[in-house]
C-alpha cells in the first residue's frame, strides 16, 4: 500500500490498525464506489475516495474504544452502506475478536451489498433485511446509531425493543447539543462524551444506562 493512502488514515494511528485492515478498508471503498454508480448507497457529496475515508471510515472507526469487546454481539441500527457496522467488523477481524456484528437494513439492495462485502472480506457479520422497529426482545452488547434516526426515536426504540444491552453509541452533528439536551428532559442517562476526530462541531455520546423520567 502506498504512502499517500496510509497518510489518509493517519488520524487512526492511535488504534494500531494493521496494513491488512487498511487493505480491507481499500477493498470496501472500491466496492462502495462501484456499487454507488448503480444504487444510492451514500450521498454523491461524500462518494469520492478521499471523502469516504475522511467522512465515513475515520468517523466510524473512532468508536472502537466504546465497543464492549467482551460481548457476543454488537448491533448497527439501519446500517445502510455499512457505516459504522462494516468498519467495526473489519477492525474486530484485525483484533482477532470473533464478536458478531448484527447489521439491520430493511432495503433489499443495501442489505445485499452488506452481505456481498461481508463475504468478500470474510467478516463476522449477520445481515438482517428487516425493519428493526418491528422486532422485539432483542439482546446485544453495544448498539451503534449513525445517521439512522434522531436520538429521542432511538432511545424509545432501545427502551421498547431491547431487553438487554451494554451501551449505545450516538454520532452527533452540529445540532447534536440541542438534540441531546432535549433528550435529557425525558430520559435519565448515564453517559460519557468524546469529541469527534472528523469535525470540530461533532461529538460522540456513549450511553450506558437509560431510564425514563416520570
Language model: regions and residue ranges:
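Residue-level signal for inorganic ion chemistry
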Residues: 32, 172, 207
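Active-site capping/gating segments
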Residues: 175-214
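Short SAM/SAH-binding signature in class I
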Residues: 140-147
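Class I SAM-dependent transferase core
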Residues: 2-69, 75, 108-112, 116-123
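Conserved SAM/SAH cofactor-binding pocket of Class I
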Residues: 61-140
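Short, polar loop motifs at secondary-structure junctions
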Residues: 131-133, 173-177
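A short glycine-rich, Lys/Arg-flanked "PGG" loop and its adjoining helix->strand segment in the class I
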Residues: 155-168
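Short glycine-centered segments of the SAM/dcSAM-binding site in methyltransferase folds
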Residues: 73, 142, 166-169
